[in-house]
């Protein structure tokens, strides 16, 4: 998991459960512990997160992990919280750039069927770029995401965080499809979310250097075309 030097702004609705810190040094150590726990999640799954293992990974005394996180449940929950914050920061610029690119595409097209298809293709290109970028450059993030999703089936404490994590992406997708011309952006966003999750899971099972881009784009294009069918048929 890529380390982040600066602590991201707390995503709305997320709170930490571990011991609060007031000094910069203490916050850095707490952050180092959580980042170490994230690396373990990627390597060994959530069940590999134990105080001793995290202390060893973070190169801190065992007493440090138990000081900030007396309960292993708090450590796992706060690790997931950090993961969600990192994701929100990591992909925010992509969605901002995508909205700008899509807006420029729409500005230079008309309402004809030909340009409607062009809009579908542009939307597909952006969605494909998003998925391929995550599969090629953020595999650790996606592996951690899969591990936390599985753990949510066992650990009810993580579910509210999982729903927030899902909602952040859905919010971006709703805005994206509304701008693309969807007549039901909320439903389309949820359907696209499920397609993206499926495509990413399949992609994680492949070598990142030999991803089947044609198949990935084909899945996404078909979904976008169905969603924006009314735009193409004008």
State where each predicted segment sits:
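N-terminal positioning helix adjacent to the helix-turn-helix/winged-helix DNA-binding module
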Residues: 29-32, 36, 188
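N-terminal intrinsically disordered/low-complexity leader segments
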Residues: 1-28, 39, 102-103, 231-234
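Amphipathic alpha-helical packing segments from all-alpha helical-bundle domains
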Residues: 89, 134-180, 190
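Hydrophobic/aromatic-rich alpha-helical bundle segments in the mid-to-C-terminal region
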Residues: 159-167, 176-234
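Hydrophobic alpha-helical connector segments
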Residues: 91-138, 192
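A short, mixed-charge helix-start or loop-turn motif at secondary-structure junctions
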Residues: 15-22, 113, 130-131, 155, ...
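Amphipathic, non-transmembrane alpha-helical scaffold segments
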Residues: 26, 30, 80, 84, ...
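Helix-turn-helix
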Residues: 32, 40-82
């Amino acid at each position: 998991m890529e380390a982040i030097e600066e602590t991201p702004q707390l995503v709305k609705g997320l709170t930490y459960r571990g011991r609060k810190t007031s000094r910069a040094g203490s916050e850095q150590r707490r952050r180092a512990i959580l980042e170490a726990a994230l690396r373990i999640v990627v390597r060994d799954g959530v069940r590999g997160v134990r105080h001793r293992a995290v202390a060893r990974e973070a190169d801190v005394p065992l007493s440090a992990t138990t000081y900030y996180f007396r309960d292993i449940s708090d450590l796992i929950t706060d690790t997931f919280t950090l993961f969600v914050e990192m994701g929100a920061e990591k992909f925010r610029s992509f969605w901002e750039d995508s909205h700008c690119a899509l807006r420029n595409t729409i500005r230079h097209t008309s309402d004809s069927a030909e340009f409607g298809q062009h809009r579908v293709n542009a939307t597909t290109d952006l969605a494909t770029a998003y998925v391929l970028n995550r599969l090629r450059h953020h595999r650790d993030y996606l592996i951690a995401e899969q591990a936390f999703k599985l753990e949510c089936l066992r650990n009810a404490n993580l579910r509210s965080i999982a729903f927030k994590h899902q909602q952040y992406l859905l919010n971006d997708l709703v805005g994206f499809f509304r701008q693309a011309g969807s007549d039901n952006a909320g439903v389309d966003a949820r359907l696209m979310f499920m397609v993206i999750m499926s495509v990413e899971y399949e992609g994680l099972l492949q070598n990142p250097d030999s991803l089947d881009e044609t198949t990935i784009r084909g899945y996404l294009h078909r979904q976008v075309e169905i969603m924006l069918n009314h735009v193409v048929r004008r």
